[in-house]
Curated annotation (Swiss-Prot):
Recorded family membership: Belongs to the phosphohexose mutase family.
Posttranslational mods: Activated by phosphorylation.
UniProt remark on cofactor binding: Binds 1 Mg(2+) ion per subunit.
Species assigned in the record: Shewanella sp. (strain MR-4)
Entry keywords, A to Z: Isomerase, Magnesium, Metal-binding, Phosphoprotein
Protein name as it appears in the record: Phosphoglucosamine mutase 1
Top enzyme class: isomerase
GO cellular component, one term: cytosol
Signal peptide positions on this chain: none
NCBIfam families documented for this protein: glmM (TIGR01455), PRK10887.1 (NF008139)
Gene: glmM1
Amino acid sequence: MSERKFFGTDGIRGKVGSGQMTPELALKLGWAAGRVLSRSGTNKVIIGKDTRISGYMFESALEAGLSAAGLNVMLMGPMPTPAVAYLTRTFRAEAGVVISASHNPYYDNGIKFFSNDGSKLDDNLELEIEAELEKPLECVESHLLGKVSRIEDARGRYIEYCKGNFPADQTLTGLKIVVDCAHGATYHIAPAVFRELGAEVIAIGDKPNGVNINDKVGATSMAKICETVLTEGADLGIALDGDGDRIMMVNSRGEVIDGDQILYILACDAKARGVLRGGVVGTLMSNLGLDLALQALDIPFARSKVGDRYVMELLKELDWRIGGENSGHILNLDHGTTGDGIVAGILVLAAMRRQNATLEQLTAPMEMLPQVLVNVRFEGEHDPLSSDKVKAAQALVESQLGARGRVLLRKSGTEPLIRVMVEGDDHNTVLAHANLIADAVKSAS
C-alpha cells in the first residue's frame, strides 16, 4: 500500500492554523473527498463536529469544498462522533465527516471520514482522496453545485437510537448517575438519554464555550467526576471524552472503572445471555487481569496493536463482536459500527439491571494487576530493543513473573521513546522489574 501523506490512523489531526489543520486544506480536502465520493452513491455527505471554537471555521471550509465538487451537504452541528456514523447510515449518505480532535485540547482539531455503512473510511479511498489533493481545485458548473441543508432533528434521532439499546422492559428509576460530558459533543445528548430512561442525572462538563473541551473534565481527567460521585452520594458516574466515542466509569466508592473492566462486564453479560460470539479483543496495553478473568470463564481473549482501528480489524478477522481499549474505546458490533461512549454506558447499566447488581459487584471477580509504564528516551538510529542486554533483562523478568505477569517493550510511534510496561501481582516488585529493564534499555541506547 502507498504511504499516506495526510491521513493518519484516525484521519487528519493537528494544531489549528499550522501544519495540515488550516482552512485552506479543509477546503481542498472537502473538494478532493467530494471528487472521489461523487463517482458513485447518493452525492450526499453529512458533517458533524464537536464543540471546539475552530469547528465553525472547518465546517464552513469543508462545506464549500464539498459543494464545489457537486455534493450536497447536511449539517448536524455539535454531535458525538458515533452519532455521525449512525446518521450517515440512516440517511443513506455516501459519507460522514467528523470535525474533532477527540480527547485533545481545544487548540487542536481534526477531520475524519466515515463510509456509507458508518465504519471508518477504507484505506484505498483515503489514498484516492490524497491523490486528488495534489490536483488544482476545479469547481463544477454552477447548475451542478451542491446544496447545503441542516438536519434539524439530529439530536432527537440520536437520543432515541441510544435509548433503543436499553431493554424495553427496564428503567433506570432509582439510580443517581453523574454524567461528565467533557464540555464536548455529548453535552446536550448524554444527560437527556439517561434522564429519559428514568435516572436522576447530575451533569458536569455540560457547558461548552469553545475553549474548555476536555479541560480538567471528561474521560481523560477523572478527578472531578470521582469527587462529584462521592459528594453527591451517586450510584455511579459516566465520563465521556470530547467527541463521545470513549467512556470511563466510576463506582459508588469513587473508584475509576476503565475500559478493560467495562469489557469484562459486557463479555460476562453476553455470555450469561447466550449471545457472546467468540471472545473479546483487547490491545497490547490491556491489563493482564482482564485476560485472566476471561480465562476463568472460558472466554477467549486476543490482543491487537494499540488503537481502536486495530481492535476493529481483529474483531472482523476473528468474527467476534466485543473489543476495546483500556482507555475507554469500546466496540460492540451488535450495537454499532464504531466506539460509542453513551451506548457502552447503556449496555453496562442494562447488565446491572438484568443481574440486579451494582457496578462494584459486576467488576469484583476481575482483579486488576499493578501495571507500571516507564518511558526511556533514546537517540540515534540504533534499536535498543535488539540489544542482547535488553533481551536478557526481559527474559529474566518474565521468568520471575511467571503466568501472573507480563512484559511489553515497544517503540513509540511519535517520539524517540522505548515504552517499558511490566505487570504482576505486587506493585513494588513490578516497579523494580520495570526499572531493571529500563536501565538495560538506557545502557543499550
